[in-house]
Design a protein with these regions (language model features):
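Individual transmembrane alpha-helices with interfacial aromatic-anchor signatures
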Residues: 127-135
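Short acidic, glycine/proline-rich loop/turn micro-motifs
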Residues: 120-126
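Short, contiguous strand/loop micro-motifs
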Residues: 16, 126-127
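Hydrophobic-ligand binding "helix-grip"
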Residues: 3, 32-33, 43-49, 58-108, ...
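Amphipathic alpha-helical segments that line or abut small-molecule/effector binding pockets
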Residues: 19-22, 137, 141
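Hydrophobic ligand-binding cavity/cleft-lining segments
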Residues: 1-50, 110, 159
């Protein structure tokens, strides 16, 4: 039986065509240029719409570097992505679900993350929930800015 999960859910509406948003946000190798928190993203395996990769964060002030392997399954037709950590580190488990929904003002990108921290982890479920929730908002705002700039650049070229 799996422990009760902590959960965060955040969304942002991005004024860009779905195809552009999908392509940019699912180009894992380019995540260090999309997200501010990643120092490196290494593709380990890719089979069709499934990618296994290693993410490495920028070093913490004390020099500690966090890195882990995740697997991501992209379903463009249904506009969803499911991911989980393969190397769980301080997490007992981490499951992530991304959805993309067309709205009148753009595409709503939603991230739902369910997880549970291991005993002895640097943060408990409540602390990690607060950290993930705060950081998701920062990263989504950055992605919105970068994807909307790319959409404007593409629209400018198309004229």
């Amino acid at each position: 039986m799996r422990p009760t999960a902590a959960r965060t859910e955040n969304s942002v509406v991005i004024d860009a065509p779905f195809d552009l948003l999908w392509d940019i946000t699912n180009d894992v190798a380019n995540w260090p240029d999309l997200f501010s928190e990643y120092a490196a993203a290494e593709i380990l395996e890719q089979h069709g719409d499934t990618v296994r990769f290693r993410l490495t964060l920028h070093p913490e002030p004390d020099g500690k570097v966090w890195s882990w392997v995740s697997e991501r399954v992209m379903d463009r037709e249904n506009r969803t992505v499911r991911a989980h950590r393969v190397e769980t580190g301080p997490f007992a488990f981490m499951h992530i679900h991304w959805t993309y929904v067309q709205t009148d003002t753009g595409v709503e990108m939603r991230w739902a993350q369910e997880f549970h921290m291991k005993p002895g982890a640097p943060l408990d479920d409540a602390g990690m929930t607060e950290r993930i929730d705060r950081n998701s908002k920062v990263q989504m705002a950055l992605i919105k800015e970068r994807v909307e700039a790319a959409a404007r650049a593409v629209a400018g070229v198309a004229r």
